Amino acid sequence: MASLQHTTASLHSKHIPKTTNILTRKPILNLSSSTFYSPKLKLKLKLPLTKTRRSTGGALGARMSSLAAGSYAAALADLANSNNTLDAITADFDKIEQLFSDPKVFDYFSSPIVEDSTKRQLIGEFATTSGFQPHTHNFLNVLIDSKRIDMIIDIIKEFEFVYNTLTDTELVVVTSVVKLESHHLAQIAKQVQKLTGAKKVRTKTLLDPSLVAGFTVRYGNTGSKFIDMSVKRKLEEIAAQIDLGDIQLAV
């Protein structure tokens, strides 16, 4: 659990963020023969030949990583709260989470083969075009400088928890086959707010074709509450009811 007290993470980068226009420049980074195009970054990135994610060192390493992520998230949340930018930085993190959810982007920025200066350049371009808060941009540079950019997803999760606690916000994850209309999401959020009594409700959307149709709703501090309105569940129930595996047919 993230705490706002006794945080040790420093949020000062030794590098001053530079702003560039991502729409006019598309540099090609000559790092290997494996190339991919990131529409989010508007860049062609050359991937290192080997994946180099940070080793967690087992359960102890995972625990230490979780504690570090909590410290970074709490420090940033404390700073954002004091500057009245909690909502803005949370919106920034939604975009960052979407970017780093691409495994190729994550592996690229996690690789020690890629120069930190190159990572900062790309992050600077993404921050500029996305309109990030200065604190958000600086925070990403801090993670690059400290070789902990590979913790970004864990940090976002921890920050989200702290934000929800500070603002009495319920996070609702809605998964559907196709993108739902905004008024449908508003109706779902309103119902969850009635169920939980939360002051505010934030919705995140995911797409999952395996649901066939309909949607699922997950909420609660750890996502423990689950509402399944998908056709997939209905089909599974029907299949269970007509299972003939144990029936002996007369010959």
Swiss-Prot record:
GO terms for molecular function: proton-transporting ATP synthase activity, rotational mechanism. Its main location: plastid. Residues 1-64 form a transit peptide. One of its GO terms (cellular component) is chloroplast thylakoid membrane. The keyword Hydrolase does not apply. Keywords: ATP synthesis, CF(1), Chloroplast, Hydrogen ion transport, Ion transport, Membrane, Plastid, Thylakoid, Transit peptide, Transport. Signal peptide: none annotated. Pfam families: OSCP (PF00213). It is found in: Plastid, Chloroplast thylakoid membrane. It comes from the Eukaryota. InterPro entries: ATP_synth_OSCP/delta_N_sf, ATPase_OSCP/d_CS, ATPase_OSCP/dsu. The keyword Ion transport applies. NCBIfam families: ATP_synt_delta. This protein seems to be part of the stalk that links CF(0) to CF(1). It either transmits conformational changes from CF(0) into CF(1) or is implicated in proton conduction. F-type ATPases have 2 components, CF(1) - the catalytic core - and CF(0) - the membrane proton channel. CF(1) has five subunits: alpha(3), beta(3), gamma(1), delta(1), epsilon(1). CF(0) has three main subunits: a, b and c. Belongs to the ATPase delta chain family. This is ATP synthase delta chain, chloroplastic.
